[in-house]
Amino acid sequence: GWHIECSAMSLKHLGERFDIHGGGSDLIFPHHEAEIFQSECCLGHDPVVQYWIHNGMVNVDGEKMSKSLGNFWTISEALENVDPLVLRYTLINAPYRQPVDFNQVMIDDSETHHGRLVTCYGEGLAKFGRGASMNKECDWRMFPELVDAANRFEEGMDDDFNTRVALVEVQAVVKMLRGLLDDMVDYNEVTDDGVYIGPISDFIAGLIGWLSEFAGEVLGLLPEEADILEAIHSEESAKDEISQDVERLL
């Protein structure tokens, strides 16, 4: 009965042809094959569905997630222990068709890499963001390295939504930005309002813009800019208070 139910619901709500049908890889046979057979015989044409997207299974510590094994997590339960953006990073760190082994080591690794992304982006935004937003010439498309990274990112996403390839490019751009931020005091000047200027400031602004577009808008891995800047301001204020306490003790 459930095969014909899905064919009937699809026809009622999506029409005789629709673009994408999703589902787990365990449903390919017999469920989805039965849907195809029923729908095409009923309607007299094919294909009814243009693209079938089958996701891999989620395993927990090497075992299939199931209620019978007692290792079943709902999204709500996972979010009680894992930041939503870290969870997203964890799940897209592998092509969606492949199984994902959901374990604490994987979550910790994702938390480290995601934290590096947000921290690096936030530092760059705080020091170069205002200049970058005002200077339209800082567009990342000016820089061949970033155009190449964007092309590789898009090629990965065009290859059946290979988000793992896309994340590799994000990590590479973060590494570039991190290196420049660590060394920027050597070849940049600071204005009275705290904005860095100098020979590489445009490139750093381009890196920030690239991350905003691809890590933020496309992959959805960045918090709101206001939240990032507020967190950085709070951290800097806390550091200042500690420094003042130390000075008083001395």
State what each model feature region is.
Residues 1-127:
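Alpha-helical recognition segments enriched in aromatics with Gly/Pro capping
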Residues 67-250:
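Conserved nucleotide- and phosphate/pyrophosphate-binding catalytic cores
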